[in-house]
């Protein structure tokens, strides 16, 4: 039975991945989060499965808790790195922290068990960081979108660069979707050359699971996207709000303290899902 580790299980993408995996059945899910109660409250599928440890195990703690992360990753066939925040927090480093925590944990586990099977890593990023995925987006619009999420994109770029530097012993894939929205699953396709907005979190999750299940190496250290295969996904109107506030936090980062969704972190740490 395959085992999947989800880092950031209380976030929008993390919850969707947990739901997709549990709905599919015949697998074990290790869900890492800062708050077990939040996960069970926001993800009914997790609440239903939590009593059956053969299906779901929840690991609550901090990313720098080596024991928690090691236990979460031990025996995993794939690891989803979807630790994230939703707005343009200055100084955000949650993606970098997660990448370093996973790599350090796998090194510890490999030292303890030489020759162990290493999981495939699937990291959530953004189509805005892959120019070839945004060929149909006007340059001015692309600039606005990148600027409105500048702090988060700097974090994602750092995490991706770090994971790519591990390509001599780890396999990672960087999933870069377009604009995301809470909606039903409409069907998905993993795509190598373009992104599409809007895309539901459930369709994104299904695509990320498909990438994680691939064993022939076609996605090794590649950037991919996920696109819907049917019409009807609603437009992510909340993205307009986050674009406006994101521009504010880019040009006037001090305003985040008063208008941001999260407490500002110390310089070396940011709050995670």
Tell what function each PLM region has.
Residues 7, 32, 82-83, 121-127, ...:
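SDR active-site strand-loop-helix element
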Residues 13, 159, 204-208:
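Non-catalytic, hydrophobic alpha-helical segments
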Residues 36-37, 41-101:
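NAD(P)H-binding glycine-rich loop region in Rossmannoid oxidoreductase-like domains
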Residues 2-27:
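N-terminal Rossmann NAD(P)H-binding glycine-rich loop of SDR-like oxidoreductase domains
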Residues 90, 101-150:
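Conserved Rossmann-fold NAD(P)-dependent oxidoreductase catalytic core, especially the SDR/UDP-sugar
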Residues 25-39:
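Conserved glycine-rich Rossmann-like NAD(P)H-binding loop of the short-chain dehydrogenase/reductase
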Residues 194-273:
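Mid/C-terminal beta-alpha module of Rossmann-like enzyme folds, strongest
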Residues 160-183:
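Conserved beta-loop-beta element that borders a ligand/cofactor-binding pocket
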